[in-house]
Amino acid sequence: MAFHILKNENHKTNLVPIVEDILSIDSAMRFAAIIDLKGNISEAIMKKGKTSLKSQKEEEHFCKQVALGRRMRNEFNKSLGKVNYVHIERERVTQIVVYPKRKTIYVTLEPKLNMERKMELVHLIKKKTAHL
């Protein structure tokens, strides 16, 4: 699915089509968020028909933690290299975090997918968000 980068009247990128595009990659996708470098949610969508495993307050807190994790990982970029992505397997959900230049992409998906498919999803998400 292709999309155009839309800008609103304040010349800010409309992130809704990007988040929708991420969610459409696979039926196992549950939630997608674009987070600024301070941990504020710029845009987030829970896929229709899916129920959140966290409250909105917990989701916002988790996004702040994702941004903090990014800052902590950046401390090791010089010695270890940049982080390609973060992948967390939990009992009820898989969490993936990708780091474009100015935003952080956080997605959750059903854990049922095999590892090869999850790596394909990481690649697709990185490709769709490289400009952020």
Give, region by region, the residue ranges found by the protein language model.
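Non-catalytic interaction/Regulatory regions outside core domains
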Residues: 1-132
